[in-house]
């Protein structure tokens, strides 16, 4: 390869300065915000949906790298970060809750994901569970409690698509294939907390390859009440989730 050690991220092992933990938001615009909460933030690279920064927590290096939306791009980010030395991944995102008792602004820590994606099948058969690492989960729960966040711990439905896979009918065709008709009600009955689009791939990849991963998300809408989040609520919820993931990273270093 050229000057970088990995094809898509444009990073070298030297860029990481020995970092073994990465915080992985989906949105590239969140990367700098997260890095800014730590010491000595420095931008490393930006290619397509992948923006990466390095910073320090208590003198130890941490990488922040966006994954983009969905499993395929997440798998690229995780694969290439692992190649240059990352062994622990903390995903931070926003989400829509599907349980009536979960409020907008609450925080969800995922223990495992319903594998509604396709990318995770490229790493392990469907019988293999998409489970979070216990130490990562514990750190996220403790970090959430430390800032007084109302926290729910449980299972997430992780879909390849935002619309049909999450049983949304407000689309061009208004059509949802039979596989997903009534699926949200089924997940609700099973106690699934929410939908998002990356955790099944992340957790399956890491659990099946000896890597550690955890997942935290801020609730920006409860789909039993409405579909469109409030912009100010989104901003506040994102801020809380970012603080939690940084504090969890500190506990894991």
Swiss-Prot record:
It is found in: Cytoplasm. It comes from the Bacteria. Pathway: Pyrimidine metabolism; UMP biosynthesis via salvage pathway; uracil from uridine (phosphorylase route): step 1/1. Keywords: Cytoplasm, Glycosyltransferase, Transferase. Disulfide bonds: none annotated. It catalyses: uridine + phosphate = alpha-D-ribose 1-phosphate + uracil. One of its GO terms (cellular component) is cytosol. The keyword Transferase applies. Its EC number is 2.4.2.3. InterPro entries: Nucleoside_phosphorylase_CS, Nucleoside_phosphorylase_d, Nucleoside_phosphorylase_sf, Uridine_phosphorylase. GO terms for molecular function: uridine phosphorylase activity. One of its GO terms (biological process) is nucleoside catabolic process. It is an enzyme of class 2 (transferase). Belongs to the PNP/UDP phosphorylase family. Catalyzes the reversible phosphorylytic cleavage of uridine to uracil and ribose-1-phosphate. PANTHER family: FI09636P-RELATED (PTHR43691:SF11), URIDINE PHOSPHORYLASE (PTHR43691). Homohexamer. This is Uridine phosphorylase. It comes from Klebsiella aerogenes.
